[in-house]
Every structure is written in structure tokens, then in C-alpha cells.
Amino acid sequence: MAKRYFEVLNWASSFLEAQGKEGYAIHYVFLERKGWDKTQWLLHMQEEMPQEEEEQLKTDLAQLLTDYPAQYLLGQAEFYGHSFIVNEHTLIPRPETEELVERCLKANPDTPLTVVDVGTGTGAIAVSLKLARPNWRVIAIDLSEEALTVAKQNAQALGAGIEFYHGNGLQPVASEKIDLLISNPPYISEQEWYLMDASVRTYEPKTALFAENNGLALYQQLIHESQTMLKADGKIYFEIGFQQGAALQELLSAAYPQKTIKIEKDLSGNDRLAIAE
């Protein structure tokens, strides 16, 4: 006898929780696969679940039990109101990074500016900026060719005209004069490995997560490279780790003594943004 949707989902959720996993993950994956919102779920939850859907759910459940990220299972993640393709070559976009995008947009109008996003990954930052500011010239750089392939797919799917470059830091565009530098670079130190969720440690690309010199290496590189490229009134927007505020304040102040350096907190009250304006 076929089981009803809510019975299967309740069982799956409880099973995950009994294994110490996030029970809601299976609900999220199921609703995304069905294309249902919460209202549609309430309308259909008492209906019988077809056998093939139950088999798919059990396959997804087995993956979630190994800490495989739900976003990789689905091949997509939501960011700043848009759906982005993701895979194991890209970091999964985080809600905290939306605050970086929001802060940059709030401070800069839709006038012709040259904007460079370093370590673009899925292209989430670059694409979100371009869609919100069509007059900006947005350049996106990544060291991973596989990540750039995904970023290009996202830009095309969402209709964002981005210039993409493969390379290290700002080197691919060293001759440019830029108005805005924005980056969410690898900033986790090896000592912080134990703080990461198992799903992040196991499946997300380590080159997009970890950096040498207590997680500061990429900031040091970008700040150094930007000094010959950033226009006199140019601005810098970095996402940072929660323990890096003081270090970024010092690095940016030393390189740009004429600018106002701000360390701003995220919605959780942790240092999250380093800004030079």
C-alpha cells in the first residue's frame, strides 16, 4: 500500500535526526525536486506518494546521510533572489555573502564603473551585481577553470554580461584601472579546520576555502596588487572570517591610509566585511 507524502517525509526527517543530521534537509530537497512551495506542500501532503518518488527520496536520503550537501544533490543554490548552478568544483554561495553584495550596491549607484570580482566561484557575486547595476562593467576572475565554466553558465542563464578571466588574483587584468574590487576569497586557516561542518570539510573545494598565513594570504596579495590598479576614489569590499577584523583593518590602513577603513558585522554579530572607501 502506497504511503502518503507527509508519512514518508516525517519518517525520512526523523531518520536523519536520529543519525545526528539536519532533518529538514530531506524536506528541502524533496520540495525543490517537486517544484512545490509550502502552500503546495500543504495542499498535497495527504496524497499518496508514487513509488518512483519514494525511491528518489531514499536515494537522496542515503546521500544526505554521508553529509553530501543538499545543494550539490540538486545542482543549484539560491543567492540574492536568483538560482545558481553549483557542483563540487564551486563553493556553495552563503547567505553571509549576500550581505557583501548588498553593502556594495548600497554604496554605489548605477553609473559606469569597472568592477572586479576575484575568486568568483559560481559567479554569484559578479552576476548579482551586474543584474542590479546594468551599467557596471563587471569582470570575474577565478583560479579554477572548472569553477569558471560554472560561472559562465550562470551568467548566460541569468542574462548577465560578465567578462571572465582565468588566473591568480588580479594578475589577468593587471593593466586595468578599477573602481571597485570585491572578493570573497579563501580565508579559513588550517587551524580552523575543526570548526567546519562535516559536509564542508568533505565535499566543498578546499582551494576555495583555505588560505595560508592564518587565512590572510589572499587578502595580502589582493591588497598589494590593487595598489597599482585601484583608482584614486576606488573602493574595496572583502568578505572576511570572524576572527580577521583587526588584521584586515591593519592591512588596509597600511596600504590605503587616505581611505576610511571599516570592519562591519553580519546579521549574526560577527565581523564579516572589510571595506575601504
Swiss-Prot record:
S-adenosyl-L-methionine binds at residues 119-123, 142, 184. Its EC number is 2.1.1.297. Transmembrane segments: none annotated. Keywords: Methyltransferase, S-adenosyl-L-methionine, Transferase. The keyword Methyltransferase applies. Methylates the class 1 translation termination release factors RF1/PrfA and RF2/PrfB on the glutamine residue of the universally conserved GGQ motif. Belongs to the protein N5-glutamine methyltransferase family. PrmC subfamily. The keyword Transferase applies. It holds the Pfam family MTS. This is Release factor glutamine methyltransferase. The gene is prmC. GO terms for biological process: methylation. It catalyses: L-glutaminyl-[peptide chain release factor] + S-adenosyl-L-methionine = N(5)-methyl-L-glutaminyl-[peptide chain release factor] + S-adenosyl-L-homocysteine + H(+).
